[in-house]
């Protein structure tokens, strides 16, 4: 009977999380900019999983990683400014797993100490004892990752699945943000750029996400 009750609570937690996820996407779609959209999504992820921190990392053209978005719980120190332009060797083990379509699920950080000492040193400094990180894919290519630190043990078993579901919307938002930035740097007063502007606008319209609730 105890196991049945526990499974019932888990099922209810999952349904509640799905409903909250749909609401987060609806709220995110109403934001004025993609930056705001991404912040809303991270806030949802962090608060609903009772995590200390939620974040997005993006890979640049030199394979360096940058923490581009971050949400932190009350009392947790922000880390974004200290996590910029990180060399490839820092996340090498993670990207190897991402290339194999695997996520990073660590319930006890001490398990990482001998397996991935470089990453362990980065994480232990931030007072992290557990984390779940999933890759972000664009056309099959890993463009970065996002995840949460110290999520509630109550939700741990389905954190990865929830992050993967939300990941599709995050990638779509990142792509829309990039296209908006392209448009902003183009000069609309130069007739030579008219064709390029029209092409960029068409790409933006194609990328606008009409995500339906899950």
Q: Which ranges hold each PLM region?
A:
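A short, aliphatic-rich beta-strand micro-motif
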Residues: 129-137
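Signal-transmission linkers at sensory-effector interfaces
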Residues: 1-36, 183
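Regulatory sensory and allosteric helical modules in signal-transduction proteins
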Residues: 76-114, 121
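Conserved nucleotide-binding and Mg2+-coordinating catalytic segments in signaling enzymes
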Residues: 26, 184-203
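GAF sensory/regulatory domain recognition
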Residues: 43, 55-89
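Active-site-proximal structural segments of metal-dependent nucleotidyl cyclase/transferase enzymes
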Residues: 202-214
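Amphipathic alpha-helical "output/dimerization" segments
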Residues: 138, 150, 154-173
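Short hydrophobic/glycine-rich mini-motifs in sensory/regulatory modules
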Residues: 136-146
